[in-house]
Structures are given as structure tokens and as C-alpha cells.
């Protein structure tokens, strides 16, 4: 599930489409060594300098992998209490586009129904000591999410940010504001 990411040294894994506690348990298990999980144990991987890091140090540090589960639809919200109860879940990340689609309002990520579901996730996660992340496609939506209690914002994408900066520069060249 996330073996390559961990073996190259990723400090966190982000697993999409988690809709149940069973899927959450499988994700956590894949990210952790025994006895907390089922991740294969080998210290001769890139993240351990191919054996250059003492085994005890490597295994201790690698066991601290941050596990981020993506809750991307109404089914995940319906099962959220069970998902949040899985030991080892650090962050639940909301996919607002998928959530909007599951609610029948595809693409409307700031629709009150979507924002209400995100607020429910924040409230339930806070009660379980789990942080919440969410994607924002504008500074305004990012600010609103922070105000709601979301702590981790996945902002836009590199190409959109670059395109918007280029458009602003082109407008400035033409004396437009």
C-alpha cells in the first residue's frame, strides 16, 4: 500500500479513498512495523542509508510515520467515528471535490452542504484528538477552512499557482489591475 514511500524516507503517507475502519486499519498497518503493523522490516533501504543507519535508530524513527487518511465522500463521513477510532490515524484529509460529487453537487466545494460536512469532520476529529486537513483551491477558501479548525491545507496545485501568477503579470504588463 505505501511501502515504496516509506522505504525512500517519506515521513508521512497519505492514503486516498478511506471509507471504513477496516480500510483505515489496513493503511495504518502498512505504514508501521511490527508489533504496530505489517510493514516489511529491512534496514537496507534508502531511508536507512542502505544499512548505514544503525537498525535500532532507523526502526525507531521509521515507526513515527505520520498516517494521513483521505475521507473523500459521504460514505467516509457515515463511518467517520469508526475510522477516527483506529489507533495510529494522525490526520484525516478531506477531499472536497470528491465529497461534493458524493453529495450530488459536483465541483461546488464551497457549497454550504460541503462546508457543513467538513465542519462535522473537524468536530468529530477534534473529539478523538485527530487533526484535519483539506484541499483549498483559493486563498479565501483556505482562510475559511483554517477558521473552521482545519490545521493542514493542501493548497491548489503548482501549475494553477504558476498560471495565476503569469496571468497577473501579463495583466500588469498591459496596465490592468
Report residues per predicted region.
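Non-catalytic positions within long, well-ordered alpha-helices that form the structural scaffold/packing
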Residues: 6-7, 84-85, 146
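Short, small-residue-biased leader/transition segments that mark boundaries at the very start
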Residues: 1-3
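Conserved anion-binding
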Residues: 10-87, 98
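Short, electropositive alpha-helical surface patch
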Residues: 142-159
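Glycine-rich, proline-tolerant flexible connector loops at the mouths of alpha/beta enzymes
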Residues: 94-110
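C-terminal helical cap(s) of enzyme catalytic domains, especially alpha/beta-barrels
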Residues: 21-37, 159-177
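Short secondary-structure boundary segments
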Residues: 17, 96, 136, 157
Amino acid at each position: 500500500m505505501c511501502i515504496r514511500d516509506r522505504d525512500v524516507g517519506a515521513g508521512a503517507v497519505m492514503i486516498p479513498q478511506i471509507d471504513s475502519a477496516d480500510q483505515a486499519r489496513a493503511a495504518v498497518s502498512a505504514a508501521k512495523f511490527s508489533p504496530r503493523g505489517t510493514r516489511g522490516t529491512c534496514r537496507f533501504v534508502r531511508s536507512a542509508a542502505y544499512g548505514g543507519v544503525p537498525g535500532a535508530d532507523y526502526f525507531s524513527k521509521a515507526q513515527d510515520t505520520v498516517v494521513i487518511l483521505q475521507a473523500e465522500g459521504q460514505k467516509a463521513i457515515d463511518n467517520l467515528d469508526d475510522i477516527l477510532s483506529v489507533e495510529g490515524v494522525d490526520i484525516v484529509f478531506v477531499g472536497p471535490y470528491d465529497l461534493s460529487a458524493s453529495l450530488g453537487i459536483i465541483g461546488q466545494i464551497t457549497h454550504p452542504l460541503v462546508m457543513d460536512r467538513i465542519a462535522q469532520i473537524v468536530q468529530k476529529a477534534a473529539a478523538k484528538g485527530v487533526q484535519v486537513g483539506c484541499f483549498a483551491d483559493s486563498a479565501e477558501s483556505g482562510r475559511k477552512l483554517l477558521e473552521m479548525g482545519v490545521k493542514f491545507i493542501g493548497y491548489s496545485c503548482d501549475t494553477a499557482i504558476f498560471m495565476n501568477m503569469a496571468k497577473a503579470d501579463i495583466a500588469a504588463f498591459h496596465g490592468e489591475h
